[in-house]
């Protein structure tokens, strides 16, 4: 699982979900990628599920890069607890995703294999995303 080793503050405010991504909107490492077309939160479990779906399909061939990291804690109150009594305990970690952000990159495989691997990974994500490639722009 992707979680920070240590953080300065245990609990943080929820990040803003408005606006487009400022950086990380183009492919940096691989030939193919997944680009978010809408914003939202991505948990460490969702990132791991998408990574596993891709790597199982490409089977030893190719290389996968994860371009997002869940660095913000999300808190939650226990079930059946009364209202108030402060902020809940950190339960999981999230990455704030804005539209246009490249989430995963892939190289070393043919385009049809990459497209299918990315399709499987996109189904694991809670937001809309699209397949992009280095040569032809968006497909």
From Swiss-Prot:
Gene3D superfamilies: Ribosomal protein L10e/L16. Residues 1-23 are annotated as: Disordered. GO terms for molecular function: rRNA binding; structural constituent of ribosome; tRNA binding. The keyword tRNA-binding applies. Part of the 50S ribosomal subunit. Binds 23S rRNA and is also seen to make contacts with the A and possibly P site tRNAs. This is Large ribosomal subunit protein uL16. It comes from Cutibacterium acnes (strain DSM 16379 / KPA171202).
């Amino acid at each position: 699982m992707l979680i920070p080793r240590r953080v300065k503050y245990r609990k943080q405010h929820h990040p803003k979900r408005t606006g487009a991504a400022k950086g990380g909107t183009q492919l940096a490492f691989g030939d193919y990628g997944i680009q978010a077309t809408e914003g939202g939160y991505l948990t460490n479990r969702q990132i791991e599920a998408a990574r596993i779906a891709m790597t199982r399909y490409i089977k030893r061939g190719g290389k996968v890069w994860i371009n997002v990291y869940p660095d913000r804690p999300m808190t939650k109150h226990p079930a059946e607890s009364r209202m108030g009594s402060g902020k809940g305990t950190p339960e999981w970690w999230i990455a704030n995703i804005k539209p246009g952000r490249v989430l995963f990159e892939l190289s070393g495989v043919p385009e049809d294999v990459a497209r299918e691997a990315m399709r499987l990974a996109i189904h694991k994500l809670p937001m809309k995303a699209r397949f992009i490639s280095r040569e032809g722009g968006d497909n």
